[in-house]
Structures are given as C-alpha cells and as structure tokens.
C-alpha cells in the first residue's frame, strides 16, 4: 500500500487516480488545508474504488503514527505542504513550521515502520533565479526567492541527511508548473479563496468570478517581457510519480533527483493568448508591478527522467488549458 500525503490535493488526487490505474493500493492522508473532503468521493467516482483515507495533520506525529498502524505501507509519496509563493512571503513561520515538521514526521514514520520507498514532492524553486536554462539536475541550487522555496531546499537537505543515515530508496522530484485537470472535469486545481497560481486566476476571470487578471511585470528580459515558465499537465506529472514509486522499489537504497517538465518555456502572455484561442473566450487583464519572489525565467531539461524513469510529458499546452477550462465550468455549473 502506498501512503499518499496530501492525496486530496491538486497533484495528489491526480496521482491517486494514476496509482489505482497501475494496480496500487492507496492510503490518502490529508487535513484539507489545501483541498476539500469532496475530492475523496470524486476519486471514488473516477476510479470505481473506495479510497482508504485518514484525516490527520502531519505535524501531529502521534496521531499520524496511531492512524496508520493498521495499514501495511510499503511506500510513501509526500505531497502535503503549503504551496503559495506569495503567501509564504507574508507568513514565513507558518511555512517553515508546516512544511518542515510534516516532512520530519513522515520520515520518522518511515524509519519506525521500516518503509524503504519514498518519493518527495520538490520544486523547481530550489534553482532560484537560474543563470543558465534549461536547468538540469546538476544545476546549482540557487538562492530561493521565497520562504516557500527555502522550505523545499531545506527539505531536500533533510532528505539527503536522512538518506545518509538510513539508506532507503528516495526519489526527489523537482517539478515545474503543473496546470490542467482530469479529463472527467471532476478534479483539478480548485483553490480555497484567492488563487495563488496563474491558471486558476485565468479561469476564474474567464468565468466572470473575478473582474480581471493581474500580470505581474512586463519588463523582464524575456521575449514579451513577462515571466517564462515550464507548464506541465498535472496528469503527466501524476504518471511520473507512479513511475517514480516503481523505480524506487526496484532500485533499493538509491537516492535520485529528477526534473519534471516539458522542457519548453511559455510566457504569461503566451499562456493567456493560447487560453483565449483554445477556449474561444476573452480574459480581461492588466499589467501590474512585479511580484516579490517571482523568478524571471525557468524551464527544465528532463532527459534524465526520460532515460531512467521511462517518462516524458505527452500532453501539450492546448490540452492543459482546455482541461482547466472544462474543470472551471463544472465548478460554476
């Protein structure tokens, strides 16, 4: 059985679907800080299976230990974390406390229960503002532009130290900008309150739920002055996690790092224009000042994941944007 922390969240829920497809049994652990309890029922609708689920704050180790003791856990995929760059700038202590303590507790559980297969949800934020793009797994770990990014750097250091003392199989996945939704329209990126990421803001403006989108900065050194990102369909990303848990189980005692993206840089304005064209709808936006913590440009070299995980992103930007709009329309209706 695979323990999926944050399994009701955006990336976690899609990964649960893909794990079921590959025949894995899944235990979801979540406290719904970034998600909704309704997701559990939607996962049942999509997969046809009743997910095993525990509601727990991972910062409470005793409760985590108690609630998992009756499950035969062979591997962990650790998604659970606060994830907003902007929010982390305003509430850094919350991010350090939650993101670091939850990781420590899950690793303690692995050590105590002798769980030797661990996949970690890291981020391209660890590269900071890279000097050379595309970034490879060998690229320099940069100066994080936000407390959120710093929690990922610290988490990676904790993982490596833990591995040196307890040589279990660890896959550290540095992924780029996941967007899109499940083809059913039942699960997707549904932020609680004001969106922190670009695409949910775009879809909410398109749906008439918000007046306009703020594009933060048009004076960056990029092709159109707006930030450049590597957007990846959440389903492709979910499939990579399944490959990673299988890879980890076959490569005992190995510590691995993988970039997960498409390898293509897309600007904010390119994304907006493509969204409008694909979905035949206009999005009202305005140019605003730069936002603290934003990196100018980053995209991935994913050749290592292709070679070792036998994984490559398959879904294109148009498919990402059309699926996200389908999900938003289902929410509205």
Locate the predicted segments by residue.
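Short, basic/glycine-rich phosphate-binding loops at helix/coil junctions
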Residues: 180-182, 219-220
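Short-chain dehydrogenase/reductase
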Residues: 96, 145-153, 188-196, 200, ...
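C-terminal substrate-binding subdomain of Rossmann-fold SDR/epimerase-dehydratase oxidoreductases
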Residues: 199-333
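Short acidic, glycine/proline-rich loop/turn micro-motifs
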Residues: 183-187, 226-227
């Amino acid at each position: 059985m695979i323990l999926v922390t944050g399994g009701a969240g955006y990336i976690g829920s899609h990964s649960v679907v893909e794990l079921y497809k590959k025949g894995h049994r899944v235990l979801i652990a979540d406290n719904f800080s970034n998600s909704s309890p309704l997701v559990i029922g939607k996962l049942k609708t999509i997969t046809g299976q009743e997910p095993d689920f525990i509601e727990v704050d991972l910062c409470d180790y005793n409760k985590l230990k108690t609630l998992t003791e009756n499950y035969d856990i062979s591997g962990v995929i650790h998604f659970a974390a606060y994830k907003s760059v902007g929010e982390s700038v305003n509430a850094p202590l919350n991010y350090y406390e939650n993101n670091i303590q939850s990781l420590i507790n899950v690793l303690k559980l692995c050590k105590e229960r002798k769980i030797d297969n661990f996949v970690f949800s890291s981020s391209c934020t660890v590269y900071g503002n890279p000097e050379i793009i595309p970034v490879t797994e060998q690229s320099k770990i940069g100066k994080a532009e936000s407390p959120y990014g710093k929690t990922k750097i610290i988490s990676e250091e904790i993982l490596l130290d833990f591995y040196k003392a307890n040589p279990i199989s660890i896959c550290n996945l540095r992924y780029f900008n996941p967007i899109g939704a499940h083809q059913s329209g039942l699960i997707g990126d549904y932020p609680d309150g004001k969106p922190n990421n670009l695409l949910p803001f775009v879809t909410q403006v398109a749906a008439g739920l918000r007046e306009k989108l703020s594009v933060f900065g048009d004076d960056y050194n990029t092709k159109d002055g707006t930030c450049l990102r590597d957007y990846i369909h959440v389903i492709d990303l979910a499939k990579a996690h399944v490959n990673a848990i299988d890879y980890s189980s076959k490569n005992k005692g190995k510590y691995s790092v993988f970039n997960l993206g498409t390898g293509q840089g897309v600007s904010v304005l390119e994304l907006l224009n493509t969204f409008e064209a694909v979905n035949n709808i206009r999005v009202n936006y305005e140019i605003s000042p730069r936002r603290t913590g934003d990196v100018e440009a980053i995209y991935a070299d994913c050749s290592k994941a292709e070679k070792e995980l036998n994984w490559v992103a398959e879904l294109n930007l148009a498919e990402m944007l059309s699926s996200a709009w389908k999900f938003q329309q289902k929410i509205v209706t």
